[in-house]
């Protein structure tokens, strides 16, 4: 049974089918080899072919290390144009994310191959019953392309994956494709130029989720003024394009909702604290990646009809320079009533999140709030791009989000929330200021700012600065927008006791 990929319009769909056959006929045959010298699915091959494979492994010093790929001469008994032997390391310890990466490596290896059919044999991997479906997930994630302004000449591949448990892999793959749809939405939104993706156009993309049963509400500038969302209004007032507050609600259960709040700065010039020209400002179309992530997560849950009550709050604005723009030294009033002295107009993300957090608390009474934002360069200095920064006082959230991140390869690392960083936010003329001390731990100071608005329920802040875009291909992400966080949050939402 072939399962079509639920890709966004800008992604090139691969075709997948799962079966339990031992067929070897294909343009490309893929086999797997572990670090303990086990080649899986060998029983399907003639003895002479097995001998040739073992000889190729020995001659090429192929260790079976995870991610290692060896292309070997095609044995005469196999009707294929190429055979790939893929190392999986220790099969007993593979995480889903590591299997995804193997799939991405295969997709990359076959990117320029003109032949379409690929036969993948995963039978015998008893410690990874979902290996086939997770492998397909990685292939699909890597095969995404943003083609709005550039045509793709990729050859669509037809992957035929042999598995031990057909029903289990088909069902799991269907759920993974829902997650892919969310990832691809987030990538599409983040890849789009800021001239095309601004608060109103983002809201229009969110409205498309109504067809999936998502309740979408868009607060216009007049609504923002009426509700006293003063921080969001202040950040957006320098642009000709007014700010919005976008809400996407998937009512998949009657439990108290989980709220995701995503920073949605569709272009960040820095305001009057303007960013340096060059690569830094050119990347600032991606400052809405947090909003893209939480909207993509809602889409993923809606497609698989997940039994979770999930609401995404996305404060959207452009941070621009004009005669109407916020200027350094301004004092603004947030929806919560706290006044903020704006000492740096380029520390605007925490301002829109403050009103977003307040709106989530006041209107949905959530059991948990997680905000997602490309917030601080300080986080990149501390952790680089291997880990996202996790800030929370909730030990269950630390454990759950850390585990979910390890499972899918979107890892998080806990950073400190400390009163000392809150003390840095004291202002002589307002309740607080929007920056800490120069040269201090900026990511922690920003998190302490957000904590003022997060409420008493469990809350976590994910600083994904450095993760929104990648300049080079990685295992499951082609160069461009990553959709980082959709897989992490989707796994967290669907794992047991995620709402505790």
UniProtKB/Swiss-Prot annotation:
Organism for this UniProt entry: Shewanella oneidensis (strain ATCC 700550 / JCM 31522 / CIP 106686 / LMG 19005 / NCIMB 14063 / MR-1)
Enzyme class: hydrolase
Residues of the signal peptide: none
Catalytic reaction(s) noted: Release of an N-terminal amino acid, Xaa-|-Yaa-, in which Xaa is preferably Leu, but may be other amino acids including Pro although not Arg or Lys, and Yaa may be Pro. Amino acid amides and methyl esters are also readily hydrolyzed, but rates on arylamides are exceedingly low; Release of an N-terminal amino acid, preferentially leucine, but not glutamic or aspartic acids
Name of this protein: Probable cytosol aminopeptidase 1
An example molecular function term from Gene Ontology annotations: metalloaminopeptidase activity
Entry keywords, A to Z: Aminopeptidase, Cytoplasm, Hydrolase, Manganese, Metal-binding, Protease
UniProt similarity note: Belongs to the peptidase M17 family.
Subcellular localization(s) per the UniProt record: Cytoplasm
Co-factor remark: Binds 2 manganese ions per subunit.
An example Gene Ontology biological process: proteolysis
Cofactor list: Mn(2+)
NCBIfam families: PRK00913.2-4
Predominant location: cytoplasm
Task of the protein: Presumably involved in the processing and regular turnover of intracellular proteins. Catalyzes the removal of unsubstituted N-terminal amino acids from various peptides.
InterPro entries registered for this protein in UniProt: Leucine_aapep/pepB (IPR011356), Macro_dom-like (IPR043472), Peptidase_M17_C (IPR000819), Peptidase_M17_leu_NH2_pept (IPR023042), Peptidase_M17_N (IPR008283)
